């Protein structure tokens, strides 16, 4: 993956004038591409859209504690997603499960969370198939994973 970003930037929005200001130093993470907050707002989950997090060509998902006063992020842990180029992360309504879509290879994975930190991967489901455009649809590509309203 060719991305070069090294962090997650936290900005403060001023509704009075519509301006954005840096609120905290960037959280360090290689090529973050999608983030989501836990339902209680205390943990930020972010995917690292890479294909070399481990020796198996996996991307990564990180859990970061959010300081609600300053916006600063503190790294809790990182887990391999089981597929390359994770592009989406979501949390169920109860805040217990974190789910990731891996674009390359078309897989989705789930993790439990305890106090914000991610467990080892609970499940990994690989989709198969290809699309009609062989130039860009040579394999399945997961774009997102979203839990239903009743989890």
What does each model-identified segment do?
Residues 1-2, 46-47, 100:
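Residue position within the beta-strands of beta-propeller blades
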Residues 8, 52-54, 59-61, 106-109:
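Structural signal for beta-propeller blades
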């Amino acid at each position: 993956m060719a991305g070069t970003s090294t962090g997650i930037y936290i900005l403060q929005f001023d509704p009075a004038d519509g301006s954005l200001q840096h609120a905290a130093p960037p959280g360090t993470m290689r090529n973050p591409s999608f983030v989501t907050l836990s339902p209680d707002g205390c943990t930020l989950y972010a995917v690292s859209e890479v294909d070399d997090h481990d020796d198996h060509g996996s991307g990564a998902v990180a859990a970061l504690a959010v300081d609600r006063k300053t916006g600063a992020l503190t790294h809790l842990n990182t887990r391999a997603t089981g597929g390359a180029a994770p592009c989406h992360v979501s949390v169920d309504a109860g805040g217990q499960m974190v789910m990731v879509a891996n674009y390359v290879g078309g897989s989705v994975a789930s993790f439990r969370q305890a106090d914000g930190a991610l467990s080892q991967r609970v499940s990994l489901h690989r989709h198969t198939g290809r699309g009609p455009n062989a130039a860009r649809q040579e394999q399945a590509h997961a774009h997102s994973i979203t839990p239903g309203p009743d989890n």
